[in-house]
Curated annotation (Swiss-Prot):
GO terms for biological process: coenzyme A biosynthetic process. Its EC number is 2.7.1.33. It comes from the Bacteria. This is Pantothenate kinase. It comes from Streptococcus agalactiae serotype V (strain ATCC BAA-611 / 2603 V/R).
Length: 306
């Protein structure tokens, strides 16, 4: 961390957890186990120490959003209607975005009773493999040009204006958009949008996804640490795919394990690390809230925008 974070308060885990005194985690160990991603070591103590204070902070931002919306409606002499509260979550592959997103979805739904909380990943806005192949950029999958950013922005605008939207579904098992299937998002009270690209600028530099976010989170760690988690996850995915020929990762189980891991290291070095350093990490200071992880996914520091 450097002067890039001059506009952030740096808060240790010990100081952060003292900002919230509740000792009940709002979920059980079994529920936490069911939502955490492969090789993510999050535990109930992390929920109490990190995520319950974060929920309190989100409540503050939510009240601020409601007050501003109400005041603007009075000023403009327009009818006030409740817009969804949109949370953007970004970070590298394998850093734990999905676990954080699913956990927040559960905690928000239990904190804001009767609220409709939707979770969407930007994977659904990747171009189908067929189009990536046609454009000669299948090896750039995950990079900015592999996403249909216009459709993603249109989706956010639709949701922000209280209109039901239908979006594509991505499957990690087939490594592609699922044909002829759509996810329906019906006017949520909260929308969590998770993906590596949620803070990135658009090519025309006229529209910015951040403009639609009421709160934003970046999950950070040292790059060598993320590489270790990526390789651990790759190995776990191979184990899951071993008996399933339809799984994208099954083909990697047909070569010697050391060759598969060499391939994974090459994918990390030539694709994921390049994407992280060039396109993902430079956007982290656009977040309102940065979660920094050390070894074993242990959250050691928080950065909160001033």
């Amino acid at each position: 961390m450097n002067n890039e974070f001059i506009n952030f308060d740096r808060i240790s885990r010990e100081n952060w957890k003292d900002l919230h005194q509740q000792s009940q985690a709002l979920l059980t160990e079994k529920e936490l186990e069911s939502i955490k991603s492969l090789n993510d070591n999050i535990n109930i103590q992390d929920v109490i120490d990190i995520y319950l204070p974060l929920i309190n902070l989100i409540q503050i931002y939510k009240r601020s959003q409601e007050n501003l919306s109400f005041s603007k409606a009075i000023f403009l002499k327009k009818e006030n209607y409740q817009r969804p509260f949109i949370i953007g979550i970004s970070g590298s592959v394998a850093v734990g975005k999905s676990t954080t997103s699913r956990l927040l979805q559960l905690l928000i739904s239990r904190t804001f009773k009767d609220s409709h909380v939707e979770l969407v990943t930007t994977d659904g806005f990747l171009y189908p493999n067929e189009k990536l192949i046609q454009n000669g950029i299948l090896n750039r999958k995950g990079f900015p040009e592999s996403y249909d950013m216009e459709s993603l922005l249109n989706f956010l605008d639709t949701i922000k204006n209280g209109i039901t939207a239908k979006i594509p579904i991505y499957s990690h098992e087939i490594y592609d958009i699922v044909p002829n299937q759509l996810q329906t998002i019906e006017t949520p009270d909260f929308l969590i949008l998770e993906g590596i690209n949620v803070f990135q600028n658009q090519q025309n530099h006229r529209l910015y996804m951040n403009d639609y976010f009421d709160f934003s989170i970046y999950i950070d760690a040292e790059n060598k640490q993320i590489e270790e988690w990526y390789l651990q996850r790759f190995n776990s995915l191979l184990q899951l795919a071993e008996a399933d020929p339809s799984n994208y990762y099954h083909k990697f189980t047909q070569i010697p394990p050391h060759k598969a891991m060499e391939l994974a290291k090459d994918i990390w070095k030539t694709i994921n690390l390049v994407n992280l350093e060039k396109y993902i990490e430079p956007t982290r200071n656009r977040a309102d809230f940065i979660i920094h992880k050390g070894k074993h996914h242990k959250i050691d520091e928080i950065y909160l925008k001033k």
